[in-house]
């Protein structure tokens, strides 16, 4: 076992603080409409230009292991916020840095770290409750477009296209983002379906950036039973390999040698393949498989109707223009099914809804109807170069996550104003001792940081703006960093999803609180560098021969 190095007490806090400072300083320059870009070097290809906080955070590794631990913990804040809300990663990083910096000052002054953490937690609970009170529902297309615009770094064209996509396929509808072929963004609504089943093995992934399996113009095999014996599949796989097209297998389950063979074929490039479990259970699974069959122009291979897997031919398979399979769901885009058949199937489901007496059955049938009739909106991102395309695509995906979060939990005034407005709720927080009161004050000071950083990135004096916003009576009053004007943030279209602000605050307080209460850090001792001339030892032996000469 390798030797370890330990640090204790204030040494720990200082080391973590240095690491957090490096990471947060790199991330926070991107905050707000006038935030700057960060260029990330890649081991191959062109560098990536981004204004996305989590993308910057993920690239940072520090040489000093103690400092790196601090940086990695704040990286976790950004990643968790991105996973939970899809946006707000820079805000979360700024909040975490602020809580840690203020917290370390208090700990070094002799206060109890555990009580400080309890005070911070109480303040965050009160602030989140107040955030929910000032939140407004986000229902109309205009508000959705505004949220998308803000999240896409004030790019109105992105906000508008997301709002249009949501209007066409519904707020719960499936929206995917693809590379476009022109300079402008384009929206296309195609026949499609998404269901909540992901790939059966991570070895099917072929897009490492999105961690997804993407198949262009694939065959789709639908099987209403478990597949475990590979012999049943071999004749069909051989025919598909000859055609050169990829394959998506949807079955009750795929296990054992059948799954292993599909994985091996995929890795070797014999057949590009992905396998997923069929959605639903029992009779509902059979019905959903039939829906997919109608959508893709295929047949469900089922012994109930006299079709066996060994005898299946390419004519029994469905197909689609594109299929995207992630860890959690599968999206079939532009299936090759006959429009008349799809229409008849939709009518059949509508009749079933009318005749059903069970609310649960009606809800499930309604879901099937939405999947079959709703279609999939595809946003095609246009750009002049590949570097711009990557950056723009990331912004569209961020904006899409933010608008979904806004629809889910509503919106609050943006630009860091919401966190300023909830500060008054901290006045009534009950504390047990002076150290907890200081914890509440740490959270209070930290919540003003995002507004100050947004203003700082515009080059204006942050203290003046923060004071003016804080002392104004109107909840929505704030500073528009893009234009330099004061006014009603909601009317100016500067909105943040409540979920994004809430998640950023909770995650930042959670990790920063843990860091403040850390008393010891343990890491591996750095390996000693070997001497530059390993042959030197042998040369030393030659001197001994000289001694022997003296004996003669």
Curated annotation (Swiss-Prot):
- Where, in this chain's numbering, is ATP bound? 30-33, 51, 87-91, 415, 480-482, 496
Q: Where is the signal peptide?
A: none
Gene Ontology biological process terms, A to Z: protein refolding
Major localisation: cytoplasm
Q: Which InterPro entries match?
A: Chaperonin_Cpn60_CS, Cpn60/GroEL, Cpn60/GroEL/TCP-1, GroEL-like_apical_dom_sf, GROEL-like_equatorial_sf, TCP-1-like_intermed_sf
Recorded GO terms, molecular function?
Answer: ATP binding; ATP-dependent protein folding chaperone; isomerase activity; unfolded protein binding
Q: Which SUPFAM superfamilies match?
A: GroEL apical domain-like, GroEL equatorial domain-like, GroEL-intermediate domain like
What keywords would UniProt list here? ATP-binding, Chaperone, Cytoplasm, Isomerase, Nucleotide-binding
Gene3D superfamilies assigned: GroEL, GroEL-like equatorial domain, TCP-1-like chaperonin intermediate domain
Q: Name one Pfam family in it.
A: Cpn60_TCP1
The answer, when asked if Cytoplasm is one of the entry's keywords, is yes
- State its location(s): Cytoplasm
Q: What is catalyzed by this enzyme?
A: ATP + H2O + a folded polypeptide = ADP + phosphate + an unfolded polypeptide
Family that this chain belongs to:
Belongs to the chaperonin (HSP60) family.
Q: Which PANTHER family match?
A: 60 KDA HEAT SHOCK PROTEIN, MITOCHONDRIAL
What does the record give as the function of this protein?
A: Together with its co-chaperonin GroES, plays an essential role in assisting protein folding. The GroEL-GroES system forms a nano-cage that allows encapsulation of the non-native substrate proteins and provides a physical environment optimized to promote and accelerate protein folding.
User: Which NCBIfam families does the annotation name?
Assistant: GroEL, PRK00013.1, PRK12849.1, PRK12850.1, PRK12851.1
Q: How does it assemble?
A: Forms a cylinder of 14 subunits composed of two heptameric rings stacked back-to-back. Interacts with the co-chaperonin GroES.
Spell out the protein name for this chain.
Chaperonin GroEL
Biological source species: Coxiella burnetii (strain RSA 331 / Henzerling II)
Specify the taxonomic lineage.
Answer: Bacteria, Pseudomonadati, Pseudomonadota, Gammaproteobacteria, Legionellales
């Amino acid at each position: 076992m390798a030797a370890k190095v330990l640090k204790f007490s204030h040494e720990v806090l200082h080391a973590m603080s240095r690491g957090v400072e490096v990471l947060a300083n790199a991330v926070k320059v991107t905050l707000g409409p006038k935030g700057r870009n960060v260029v990330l070097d890649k081991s191959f290809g062109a560098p990536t230009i981004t204004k996305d906080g989590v993308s910057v955070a993920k690239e940072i590794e520090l040489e000093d292991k103690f400092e790196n631990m601090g940086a990695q913990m704040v990286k976790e804040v950004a990643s968790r916020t991105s996973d939970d809300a899809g946006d707000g990663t820079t805000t979360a990083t700024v909040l975490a840095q602020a809580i840690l910096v203020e917290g370390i000052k208090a700990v070094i002054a002799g206060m109890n770290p555990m009580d400080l953490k309890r005070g911070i937690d109480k303040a965050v609970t009160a602030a989140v409750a107040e955030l929910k009170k000032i939140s407004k529902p986000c229902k109309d297309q205009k508000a959705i477009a505004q949220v998308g615009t803000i999240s896409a770094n004030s790019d109105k064209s992105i906000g508008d296209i997301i709002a249009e996509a949501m209007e066409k396929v519904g707020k719960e509808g499936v929206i995917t983002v693809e590379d476009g072929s022109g300079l402008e963004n384009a929206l296309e609504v195609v026949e499609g379906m998404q269901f909540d089943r992901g790939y059966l093995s991570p070895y099917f992934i072929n897009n490492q950036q999105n961690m997804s399996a993407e198949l262009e113009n694939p065959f789709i095999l639908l099987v209403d039973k478990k597949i475990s014996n590979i012999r049943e599949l071999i004749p069909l796989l051989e025919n598909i390999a000859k055609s050169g097209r990829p394959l998506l297998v949807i079955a009750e389950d795929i296990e054992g040698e059948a799954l292993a063979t599909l994985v091996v074929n995929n890795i070797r490039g014999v057949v590009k393949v992905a396998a997923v479990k069929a959605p639903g259970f029992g009779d509902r699974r059979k019905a959903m498989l039939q829906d997919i069959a109608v959508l893709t122009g295929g047949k469900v291979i089922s012994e109930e109707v006299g079709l066996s897997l060994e005898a299946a031919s390419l004519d029994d398979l469905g197909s689609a223009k594109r299929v995207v399979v992630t860890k959690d769901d599968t999206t079939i885009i532009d299936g090759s099914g006959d429009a008349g058949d799809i229409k008849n199937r939709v009518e059949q489901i509508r009749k079933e809804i009318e005749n059903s007496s069970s609310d649960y059955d009606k809800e499930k049938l309604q879901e099937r109807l939405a999947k079959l009739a709703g279609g999939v909106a595809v946003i095609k991102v246009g750009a002049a170069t590949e570097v711009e395309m990557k950056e723009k695509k990331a912004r569209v995906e961020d904006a899409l996550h933010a608008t979904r979060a806004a629809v889910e939990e509503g919106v609050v005034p943006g630009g860091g104003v919401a966190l300023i407005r909830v500060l008054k709720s901290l006045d009534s927080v009950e504390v047990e001792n002076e150290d907890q009161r200081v914890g509440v004050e740490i959270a209070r000071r930290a919540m003003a940081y995002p507004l100050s950083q947004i203003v700082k990135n515009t080059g204006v004096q942050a203290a003046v703006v923060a004071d003016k916003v804080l002392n104004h009576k109107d909840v929505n009053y704030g500073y528009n960093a893009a234009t330099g004007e004061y006014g009603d943030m909601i009317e100016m279209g500067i909105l943040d999803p409540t979920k994004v602000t809430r998640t950023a605050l909770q995650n930042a307080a959670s990790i920063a609180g843990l860091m403040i209460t850390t008393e010891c850090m343990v890491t591996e001792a750095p390996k000693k560098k070997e001497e530059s001339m390993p042959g030197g030892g042998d040369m030393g032996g030659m001197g001994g021969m000289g001694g022997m000469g003296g004996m003669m």
